[in-house]
Amino acid sequence: MKIKTRFAPSPTGYLHVGGARTALYSWLFARNHGGEFVLRIEDTDLERSTPEAIEAIMDGMNWLSLEWDEGPYFQTKRFDRYNAVIDQMLEEGTAYKCYCSKERLEALREEQMAKGEKPRYDDRCRHSHEHHADDEPCVVRFANPQEGSVVFDDQIRGPIEFSNQELDDLIIRRTDGSPTYNFCVVVDDWDMEITHVIRGEDHINNTPRQINILKALKAPVPVYAHVSMINGDDGKKLSKRHGAVSVMQYRDDGYLPEALLNYLVRLGWSHGDQEIFTREEMIKYFTLNAVSKSASAFNTDKLLWLNHHYINALPPEYVATHLQWHIEQENIDTRNGPQLADLVKLLGERCKTLKEMAQSCRYFYEDFAEFDADAAKKHLRPVARQPLEVVRDKLAAITDWTAENVHHAIQATADELEVGMGKVGMPLRVAVTGAGQSPALDVTVHAIGKTRSIERINKALAFIAERENQQ
């Protein structure tokens, strides 16, 4: 049997991390078994579904590189198919027309709740033989079995049973002729030959209804696996107050897709004590029986740690392709300065996100208007004039511009003046970067370049002279 899974989001908002994890688990399960992964857009909620949300979902899937083998399918383009199946069910007696008004149903609901009963349809039209005009408004309901129970072996939670007496006759077509969500899902899974449905635990109560409809259609019933919810680190349901929840917001905040995928796969699944997984390892090791039944807690610090790991572990040339987007957001012109891959090597240890890296690299490419006030006050003092002049001349004399030769020039300045490296290094750092912190000074000066470094040292010397004149 060919394994076939699906990810079926509703386009009423962005792709959130819970949906992304569900997509990842479905994708991994299919890939682990050499099967196929289907993308289906469940856009039956015409009022809330938007083109922007569809685009956001596709962007998120593409950014995570969760490629699909079929689709994307859109439910709104399959209404003829759904209605054909409903008409067939009406002929076979597994569905019936219901003419009950909203007022009657609301009164029934209030009466049942007043008695402490669970609100449900009372099957009035199921047993009615009244004649109705063809154009009289009605819904179509599924004639749910009234005896027995529905049992399915959830691949994460084990056997789950529902009594059919707990399930009322579900509306499968509205008065406007549009099919409902639970029915469309069933026909889609049947037509698309889905073998395994991996989805959130909020769908557990839909499962017995969908199984009963599948059985009424004499269609194969897929295997179900319901993944637990994701909570914030305070144990409450993950929401915006815990930080970003949109996949693309993590992109915007400077995370690599590899880091987010690695974090999401471990958010409810484990393989021994291993924490770091390549995509190939995820595919190789992923199984549903290793997915936890318990809710997972989202820990941003752990994700940040993983992101820092991947910034330094992945090839710099690859990381640079993602960094480029953030550089563009900062409006930095990188034509005159180090290659982005070299920048990744330079700043990787210091920066935990690509956004942070982009925001801290401007001085490599563009001259700064002024020095950091605190750093200048501390290090650009008259005592720094001689070290800056000497190191400037030694840097100017370098014919082979390498980080090693830059280091020798700084060391030679300290030796010549008989001062510690800090007496040369700190004024030089402020002079060439405008701030008091940077990566190792030799590689920083090398990356900034000979001409630009000397120009900035001269600017710092002028700054010192100007301050002296003001005193």
Curated annotation (Swiss-Prot):
A motif ('KMSKS' region) lies at residues 237-241. It comes from the Bacteria. It comes from Shigella dysenteriae serotype 1 (strain Sd197). ATP binds at K240. Belongs to the class-I aminoacyl-tRNA synthetase family. Glutamate--tRNA ligase type 1 subfamily. Binds 1 zinc ion per subunit. It is found in: Cytoplasm. This is Glutamate--tRNA ligase.
